[in-house]
């Protein structure tokens, strides 16, 4: 994209040297807010991930990747692999009406880790 197709008031040269008075009226420049630019030359990807993770998790400090991936690690699979239907088992469970063979509603549903996280959170808060 060429600069001629842009609006007339957009200038690409010397954006970093623009005065603070100009910056207060205009929205902040995107690359001024960039973490990699602000923290020196080129930060490595690991440092960037560490900064982002510690900033997003707030006062708890840095947590391990395993803690971030708790739902990926603790996901449980029910029955014969989730949604795949085994016709004999399905007919047997439908045909038999004895109470011990009934599954609970939680076991029939497909596991949803995001919904479980919200339920756990609201149980803790309220």
From Swiss-Prot:
It comes from the Eukaryota. Residues 1-101 are annotated as: Disordered. GO terms for cellular component: cytosol; nucleus. Residues 14-27, 86-99 have a biased composition (Polar residues). This is Uncharacterized protein PB16A4.06c.
């Amino acid at each position: 994209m060429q600069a001629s197709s842009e609006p007339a008031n957009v200038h690409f040269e010397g954006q970093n040297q623009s005065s603070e008075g100009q910056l207060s009226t205009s929205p902040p420049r995107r690359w001024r807010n960039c973490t990699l630019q602000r923290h020196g030359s080129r930060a490595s990807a690991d440092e960037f991930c560490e900064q982002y993770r510690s900033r997003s998790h707030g006062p708890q400090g840095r947590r391990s990747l395993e803690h971030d991936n708790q739902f990926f690690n603790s996901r449980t699979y029910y029955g014969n692999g989730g949604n795949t239907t085994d016709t004999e088992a399905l007919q047997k469970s439908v045909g038999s009406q004895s109470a011990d063979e009934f599954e609970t509603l939680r076991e029939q549903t497909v596991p949803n880790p995001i919904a479980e996280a919200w339920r756990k959170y609201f149980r803790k808060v309220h």
